[in-house]
Amino acid sequence: MDRMLLTRVLSSILLAFISVAVPASAAPASGSPLLFPPNPLPGIEAAASPAQSSDARLPDPRLKDAYKFNQGGWTYVHLEGTPEEVGFQHGFLLAREIEDNVHVYTVTAPHEDKRPWSFFKQAAKNVLWPHIEPEYQAELKGIVEGLHAQGSTLDLWDIIALNGDIELSNYYLPTINKKEGMPNPVAAVAPGKCSAFIATGSATKDGKIVIAHSNWSSYAEGERWTMVFDIVPASGQHILMDGLPGVITSQDDFGVNSSGLMITETTLPMAKGFDVNGIPEFERSRKAMQYATSIDEYAAIMREGNNGGYANSWLVGDRKTGEIAYLELGLHNTPLTKKKDGYFVSSNFSADPALIRDDTPGFNPNNFESSMNARHIRAEAFMKQHYGNLDTALAEAYLSDHEDSYEHKIDAGKRSLCGHEDTSPVGEKVWGNAPYDPGGAVTGKVMDSDMAARL
């Protein structure tokens, strides 16, 4: 099956807001259940409708405003209330999915990171937990309470480790290995592997913002990266984002808030450094999406307490003003560029010279054979070709593009904007990926200002 053929999924609930394009192979095939099949939970009454394959309305007062349903391979989850209530709803509604998600990491950690899951749980307790704000501590505890109400034995440190997996395994672990004089596992490096753009003004068909993002990950993770979280917190902005079961931020990242901020990112390549006294990235990215009402506010929240974990190039648009921004968030350098006319592309390359020097010293901008630079070249060519006409349809074409700019041919592989690492006979050396690595683009999402306005 050609994974690059995208299936456009438009839930009637999401229709007014977001166009979600999913690679045909990303969603589990019928008859191929996950480790913990999403069977109806105890007490759930299904209510079928054209828009909803199942609807959960539960008697517990903490769950009165919560529900979920499945559509087109996605699970739509509505959470509403105090941090404790939002967390409880999350844990209760997605208990089986969270169990399954944690299981993936407990299996892969010893192989990829050469450390048992218990190592990450201990780091979650000692390194991350002390720096998480009370609001999000309460939400995380709520997830555990919801899990326990469904009979799960997962504990708080499982959930913190799940939320912090990327920053612990790819940023914290290398610093510990260096300190202990241990070799760093090939897989324990800052990941790359996402493609995105944001455009506005004369670059787009209607002069408004268009944003697009594809999530590249292992297929073990990607099969589970199928949540759409609709969160109405007691304080802050109403937010809509994709995500993973048990994780309080998008982590993908793709979302919008009711103030009109449109947000995504791609990971900075080979980022180094981790501040154990900083605020976890998963909290900062959630807080920024929930509370920021402008690009400057968003950047300020992401910069405050920056621990260097999960260092990303953030693409942010403000629907209210039409302004877009590019925030490279390294540990030592965090340059912010804004414009009201033009575009930014992102494909896991570093742009700022000081950031390359201090934060991503392993990145070689002149290695055009690498995935990140080859995609950068193709992304720029796509923007120039379609400048002035960019809309959601062209955004989908961008995410499904298969051109290899290095070999000058159509080839669905590691160098195409829509990634197929599993078809590539040459692994991506800078990420330590072997040939035919089982990973690639697993989801694609596009949005424009008009969609964002209807949240």
State the predicted function of each range.
Residues 15, 207, 260, 321-322:
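Detector for glycine-centered tight turns/loop "hinges" at secondary-structure junctions
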Residues 11-21:
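Bacterial N-terminal signal peptides
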Residues 1-13:
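Bacterial N-terminal signal peptides that target proteins for export
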Residues 24-31:
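Boundary at the C-terminal end of the N-terminal hydrophobic targeting segment
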